[in-house]
């Protein structure tokens, strides 16, 4: 207990006095190397890493910064690799004791803390300047890829691995492009066999980061298309929507992200109508987060036809959305009104109202 309190105090000191603590970096690194011997709570250990990373962030020499980040990551990668080496070729795993040195999540969360809090130059690295963390993240990818493969049946480890990848991608943005193809290929294959919704969530992060690059959009749309069949398979069985609200939430978040970042290519896909049909069925789901994602999808879909009127693609977007509204508008409003009256709780009414208002703005006469 005392060790955890001391670690928390040290974290606060690192955060408040970064400039003064920079000269003690090597000493802090030695503490990180011994952290598993201190019997710290996971939160305290992660906080300690956060404090050290804050100090690294103010280093002005990019080479020194990159070297410091790599050293912190190696301290976590070494035990993580040792744990994975204990998994047999047949996939048999030694028992994982949560929050112990046998738990890969312990080290994945620490890596997440590194990439979540590292901010070279205050977080503003120019696009044409190599990110100091790029080499470390590219070197780390084989380890994370292996973790996804080895622990594919363990949703807890898979979620934490995806979380680490998410923060790594957010850290260096489009400079992680070398990882995009192998990452998407592995995500698609593993989602087809295991259908963990965290892959859908990670997919939405990739869309957010890469959809601004025109050359990446076809591959991202192919990723979404590959996700559709496994998603429909688990949602279409009796009780599937109720049993898998996280999948509903993450699937429609992913689709909404395309509407926000690459609306025209998304609106032109052949599979969009099937997504709309799935959304209509999902709109009656009484689950706060899942229902909110479905409504956000409907809202973003309709709003895409009116948003950014000065943009060059506005006329194309408007035409595509009008065609969809003409086919689905009445059915959508009817479904939402019935669901609000008979099934859904009052906390959904605001989102439902926003969707219906967008429908009215498109064609008030038809919907009277």
Q: What are these model-derived regions, one by one?
A:
Residues 1-368:
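Karyopherin-beta/Importin-beta family HEAT-repeat alpha-solenoid scaffold
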């Amino acid at each position: 207990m005392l060790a955890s309190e001391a670690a928390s105090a040290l974290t606060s000191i690192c955060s408040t006095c970064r400039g003064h603590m920079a000269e003690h970096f090597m000493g802090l690194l030695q503490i990180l190397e011994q952290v598993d011997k201190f019997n710290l709570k996971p939160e305290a250990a992660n906080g300690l890493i956060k404090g050290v990373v804050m100090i690294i962030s103010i280093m002005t020499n990019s080479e020194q910064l990159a070297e410091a980040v790599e050293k912190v990551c190696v301290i976590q990668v070494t035990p993580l690799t040792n744990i994975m080496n204990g998994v047999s070729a047949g996939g048999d795993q030694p028992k994982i004791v949560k929050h112990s040195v046998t738990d890969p999540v312990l080290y994945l969360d620490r890596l997440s803390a590194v990439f979540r809090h590292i901010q070279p130059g205050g977080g503003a690295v120019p696009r044409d300047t190599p990110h100091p963390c790029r080499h470390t993240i590219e070197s780390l990818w084989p380890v994370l890829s292996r973790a996804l493969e080895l622990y594919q049946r363990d949703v807890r480890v898979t979620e934490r691995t995806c979380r680490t990848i998410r923060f790594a991608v957010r850290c260096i943005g489009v400079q992680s492009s070398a990882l995009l193809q192998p990452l998407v290929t592995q995500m698609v294959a593993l989602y087809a066999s295991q259908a963990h919704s965290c892959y859908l969530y990670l997919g939405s992060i990739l869309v957010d980061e890469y959809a601004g690059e025109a050359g990446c959009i076809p591959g991202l749309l192919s990723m979404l298309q590959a996700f559709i069949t496994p998603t429909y398979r688990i949602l279409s069985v009796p009780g599937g929507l109720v049993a898998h609200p996280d999948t509903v939430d993450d699937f429609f978040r992913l689709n909404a992200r395309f509407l926000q970042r690459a609306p025209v290519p998304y609106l032109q896909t052949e599979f969009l109508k099937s997504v709309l049909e799935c959304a209509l069925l999902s709109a009656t789901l009484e689950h706060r987060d899942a229902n909110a994602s479905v409504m956000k999808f409907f809202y973003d879909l309709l709003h895409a036809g009116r948003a950014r009127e000065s943009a060059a693609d506005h006329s194309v977007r408007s035409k595509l959305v009008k065609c969809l509204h003409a086919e689905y508008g009445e059915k959508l409003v009817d479904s939402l009104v019935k669901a609000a009256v008979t099934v859904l709780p009052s906390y959904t009414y605001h989102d439902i109202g926003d969707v219906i208002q967008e429908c009215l703005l498109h064609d008030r006469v038809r919907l009277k």
